[in-house]
Amino acid sequence: MSSGGLLLLLGLLTLWAELTPVSGQDHPKFCYLPADPGRCKAHIPRFYYDSASNKCNKFIYGGCPGNANNFKTWDECRQTCGASAMGRPT
């Protein structure tokens, strides 16, 4: 293979590595915790990552203490835990 062909192959492999989604093993451990509304009685809409479906879902947070699988926005949840962009809640 010529040096130009090798360079092209290297470039394509590098691009593929950059565009390939992060594997589940690279998610923060708290992404695998269940949704936890906490023991308080507030009614705060939040999102949690559901590792079984690879989606961020809505839940109602009570305000304290809960766990770290608790995000103010769907985008924050998806970016942190690597959820699928499909099935965005309305």
From Swiss-Prot:
The keyword Signal applies. CDD domains: Kunitz_PPTI-like. The record marks 41-42 as: Reactive bond for trypsin. It comes from the Eukaryota. It is found in: Secreted. GO terms for molecular function: serine-type endopeptidase inhibitor activity. One of its GO terms (cellular component) is extracellular space. Expressed by the venom gland. Pfam families: Kunitz_BPTI (PF00014). Residues 86-90 form a propeptide. Coiled coil: none annotated. Residues 31-81 form the BPTI/Kunitz inhibitor domain. PROSITE patterns: BPTI_KUNITZ_1 (PS00280), BPTI_KUNITZ_2 (PS50279). SMART domains: KU. SUPFAM superfamilies: BPTI-like (SSF57362). The modification Pyrrolidone carboxylic acid is found at residue 25. Residues 1-24 form the signal peptide. Keywords: Disulfide bond, Protease inhibitor, Pyrrolidone carboxylic acid, Secreted, Serine protease inhibitor, Signal. Disulfide bonds join 31-81, 40-64, 56-77. Belongs to the venom Kunitz-type family. Serine protease inhibitor that principally inhibits trypsin (Ki=0.34 nM). Also inhibits alpha-chymotrypsin (Ki=270 nM), plasmin, plasma and pancreatic kallikrein. This is Kunitz-type serine protease inhibitor 1.
